[in-house]
């Protein structure tokens, strides 16, 4: 290319790159897992299986069957590059490319390990335990240091990131650290006031006080009864959205009682 042409004409060859190190750091790995809202509330531990490159146990990352040191590449004389002459519109020009024998390392392994073919690493599955903290939300990632891919030549491993997804819940809808729910309140209880129990995420019950005169669409806030704050003190709120349940079938006595109640209401209360 033009870069090679200018390099050849203007002395760029003197600044040619050094052969790359055979030992390279490994890449990070990503794993996705799913938990329930109850597990996100309390925190949990989850066993996962990961498939990554690990250190070759046969050669211990050297890539050599005898664990001998690599020797200087005879093709590029250890530079990791070879020069070639190519025809161009300017005539013959010298270009530089990666040595195909040593793949740019400047050295070769004379007796490659049969297990890893000289790479110093092999693919393997591993079982790990992930500690998932209370308060975690969908899309958040947990970093497990040095549990990712081992690098070429037995280089240091990258990190493993576990991305968490929280399943939808049949009762609660999460918004940040708040928990929303629909609370069905019988018409009589909405008028007179009552206490209702709902199952919470901790496995117990939360008592919700419904004041007399509660209207459809009203919200009742319970401070500190929501999701715990991730790695912090306190929790969000539980917010109950009231739906007043109007009976569809009435006994004669119930109908008579409601008619008496309606008859005693002032006119402005019926608007």
Tell me what each language-model feature is.
Residues 1-24, 67-72, 76-98:
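Long amphipathic alpha-helical segments used for membrane anchoring, targeting, substrate engagement
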Residues 5-6, 35, 59, 76, ...:
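Residue-level signature of catalytic and energy-coupling elements of molecular machines
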Residues 22-45, 107-271:
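Charged, often glycine-enriched C-terminal and inter-domain segments
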Residues 41-48, 57-64, 83-90, 98-104:
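Short, intrinsically disordered, charge-biased short linear motifs at domain edges
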Residues 53-56, 62, 70-73, 96-99, ...:
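Residues immediately within or flanking Cys/His clusters that coordinate Zn2+
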Residues 56-58, 172-173:
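Short aromatic-acidic-glycine turn motif
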Residues 60-63, 74-80, 103-106, 114-120:
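Cys/His-coordinated zinc-binding microdomains
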Residues 66-70, 83-87, 109-112, 123-127:
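Short Cys/His-rich "knuckle" micro-motifs
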């Amino acid at each position: 290319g033009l870069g090679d042409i200018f390099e050849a004409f203007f002395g760029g060859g003197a600044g040619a790159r050094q052969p790359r190190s055979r030992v390279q750091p490994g890449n990070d790995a990503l794993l996705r897992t799913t938990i329930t809202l109850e597990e996100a509330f309390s925190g949990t531990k989850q066993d996962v299986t990961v498939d990554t490159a690990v250190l070759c146990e046969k050669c211990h990352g050297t890539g050599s069957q005898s664990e001998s040191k690599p020797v200087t590449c005879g093709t590029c004389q250890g530079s990791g590059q070879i020069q070639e002459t190519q025809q161009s519109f300017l005539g013959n020009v010298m270009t530089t490319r990666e040595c195909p024998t040593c793949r740019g390392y400047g050295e070769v392994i004379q007796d490659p390990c049969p297990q890893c073919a000289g790479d110093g690493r092999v693919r393997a599955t591993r079982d790990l335990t992930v500690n998932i903290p209370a308060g975690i939300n969908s899309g958040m990632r947990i970093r497990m240091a040095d549990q990712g891919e081992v690098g070429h030549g037995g280089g240091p491993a990258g990190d493993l990131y576990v991305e968490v997804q929280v399943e939808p819940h049949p009762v609660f809808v999460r918004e940040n650290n708040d928990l929303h729910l629909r609370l069905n309140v019988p018409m009589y209880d909405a008028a007179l006031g009552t206490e209702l129990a709902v199952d919470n995420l901790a496995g117990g019950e939360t008592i919700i006080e419904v004041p007399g005169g509660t209207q459809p669409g009203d919200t009742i806030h319970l401070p500190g009864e929501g999701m715990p704050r991730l790695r912090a003190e306190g929790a969000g709120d539980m917010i109950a959205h009231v739906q007043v349940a109007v009976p569809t079938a009435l006994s004669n006595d119930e109908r008579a009682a409601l008619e008496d109640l309606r008859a005693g209401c002032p006119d402005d209360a019926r608007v």
